[in-house]
Structures are given as structure tokens and as C-alpha cells.
Amino acid sequence: MQRITYLGPEGTFSEAAMITLRTTGRIPGSSEVEPVSVASAREALVQVQAGDADYACVPIESSLEGPVVPTLDTLAVGAPLQIFAETVLPVSFTIAVRPGTAAGDVKTVAGFPIAAAQVREWLATNLPDAELVAANSNAAAAEDVKAERADAGVCTEWAAQRLGLHALASGVVDEAHAHTRFVLVGRPGPPPAATGADRTSVVLGLGNVPGALAAAMNEFAIRDIDLTRIESRPTRTGLGTYRFFLDCVGHIDDIAVGEALKGLHRRCEDVRYLGSWPRGTTAPTGANPPVLDEASGWLAETREGRLR
């Protein structure tokens, strides 16, 4: 049985993402899973690094708020980790209250910071005088309401139902079509086979020399590889020192992507490969890398003196 950590407690979007990955057969190995709820995305990943869990299911990107910083920072340091799968979930929230609570009774609202940011306008319009208090997760916000530590909570519908809370409002989100991307992370191993609709991710450490970032980007540009995400995060070793997170369309087994990764290894102080895996959405996301088999064949013939 495989042990999978996720940002808990029960009733979070992370749990829903883990269930989606399990029911769609995207968790490598045994289909028998032991879900383990933990208090943070960082803890979920650290347990995998320590060998106390086989995989972690954690959020990595919000369409409204961008990168999930604790996930990025933990992926970049410590024992190597690798992403094996992803899923994208539509996101909306329930504003949960204890039975009998009206909007006028709400003085405090518990919310996971990423979730609270996605309903900021709704709260300002409908609960303008309420104080926002931080919760460890969406489900923890519901538990804060149940325990009377807050009058209302920004949570998932199923977290509210599980605790017998009522919905002051349902389907709340400031922007329509909000989504969050979740990834399944394990210790390094062979990546899933290429599907033709894949994503590859790396973390780069660059030297403090002119043009270092441009040179790294050029490894993708000269091969017509589409970059879909570029993020920078401080290394925490001093001011002005950053590492860069890059996602591109394609798979390490694609010739163009493989050549780009070799180029990065030559140019960069450090390259941490985070994996190649099938994209979690069927919507087109960038252009696939070019097929270089013909070019490779031409080069082989030229080396043999068979000029065309």
C-alpha cells in the first residue's frame, strides 16, 4: 500500500486532487493508497524526502494567485523530488457558518491565505466589517468555524457538509473559471512515458554573470521549445540571489527537449530536473517541440559522406 501525504485535513482541494489522480490511474505502482493528512504542503513534501511517504499531492499553481510558494521552495532544496502527474481542478468556495448565523453576526472569517485571496472582493462587498484570520487550509477554516474560533470560514463545500455547517454563500470566487493545478510528487524515478501532451520542469541556479538568464532561455528558443512558465524565488543565501523555475512543453524523451536540458547542464551552475509528465488538462497549452528525427538522419548521413 502506498502512503500519500496531502494538505489536510479532510475536505481540502488537495484531497480532492489526490482522489482524482487515484481514480484516473495516474499514481504509479499499487492502486492501494493510504491517504495521510498533514498540516502544510511543505510537510507533505518533506515526508517524501525523508522516505516516510511514497508520494505527496500538493498545489503548485493558481490561475488567480500564481505560484504556490511553499511548494516551489521545497521542491528546490533538500533531497531531490520528481513530479509524476498533475491534475487541474476548478475552484470555488463556500462561506460556511454555524447553523443560525446570519451575515450580520459575522465578525471574523477564517481563510487559507491562497483561498482568501480568491474571494477578496466578495468578502469586501458582503462582509466588509469582518476580520480575516489565517487558517492552515480550507478544511482547517471550516474546523475553526465548528470550534467557534471564527464566525465564518472560506472552505470547500464538502468540508462544510462534513462538519454540519451551513452555507452563507456557495460557489464564491472573484473571477470565473478559476483553477488550481496540483502535482503528484515522489522520489526520483523513470518518468511516465511521453504522450505528446507533456510538461517538463526544471529549477536553475545561474552564475552572477551578464547574460546568464538569456543564455539559459536561448537553449529553448533555438530549438523552438515553448516555455509556459518562468518564476524566480530567492535562494535565501543573500540579497540578489535567485533560482529560476521553468516549465516547457514537451518530454525529456523528445529529442529537442533532451538537447535543451543538456545545454542547460553545460551553462548553468545547477540544474534540478523536476520531471516530465502528462499535462493535466486537454486544453491546448503551447506548441509541441519540433521533431528532430529528420535532422538527426541528415547529420548521420553527412558524417558518412552521403551528402544530399
UniProtKB/Swiss-Prot annotation:
Tell me which species this is from.
Mycobacteroides abscessus (strain ATCC 19977 / DSM 44196 / CCUG 20993 / CIP 104536 / JCM 13569 / NCTC 13031 / TMC 1543 / L948)
- Stretches assigned to the ACT domain: 201-278
SUPFAM superfamilies the UniProt entry points to: ACT-like (SSF55021), Periplasmic binding protein-like II (SSF53850)
GO CC term (a single one): cytoplasm
Protein name per the record: Prephenate dehydratase
Q: Does the keyword Protease apply?
A: no
What's a Pfam family in this record?
Answer: ACT
The entry describes its oligomerization and partners as:
Homodimer.
Q: Which gene encodes it?
A: pheA
